[in-house]
Curated annotation (Swiss-Prot):
Pfam family, one: Ribosomal_S18
Listed name of the protein: Small ribosomal subunit protein bS18
Quaternary data: Part of the 30S ribosomal subunit. Forms a tight heterodimer with protein bS6.
Keyword hit for S-adenosyl-L-methionine: no
GO cellular component assignments: cytosolic small ribosomal subunit
Originating organism: Anaeromyxobacter dehalogenans (strain 2CP-1 / ATCC BAA-258)
Function summary: Binds as a heterodimer with protein bS6 to the central domain of the 16S rRNA, where it helps stabilize the platform of the 30S subunit.
Family that this chain belongs to: Belongs to the bacterial ribosomal protein bS18 family.
Amino acid sequence: MARPDMGGPKTGGFGGPRSGGFGGGGGGGFGGGGFGGGRGGDRGDRGDRDDRGGDEGGGRRGFGRRKVCRFCADKALKVDYKDQGQMKYFLTERGKIIPRRISGNCAKHQREVATAIKRGRMLAILPYTVGQM
């Protein structure tokens, strides 16, 4: 026999009907309860994921060509900290080193480029930052 203060089997757990307590029921489960009860809320029907339209998915996205490391492609090209024009290609307009996902360098040559840029900065060939803002 259920105790009167615990609510019956169809009341939604501890604390009576729609208490918002621990049980399931209409109150919304663990601490949910609150305003209006039920599961609708004020968000309306959002529909299933399938009904939202958009692309069918599958396949690759159109990112264009894969970037190739210019130092691996042209074996004659070497990373040189003294070549300011070459090193500026791997710097943003604010003086930051461009990451390899954008520059297309392989890991080996990206490390060499970063080291060369840092050497060039120390010798005042390349800027640490851009001048006045």
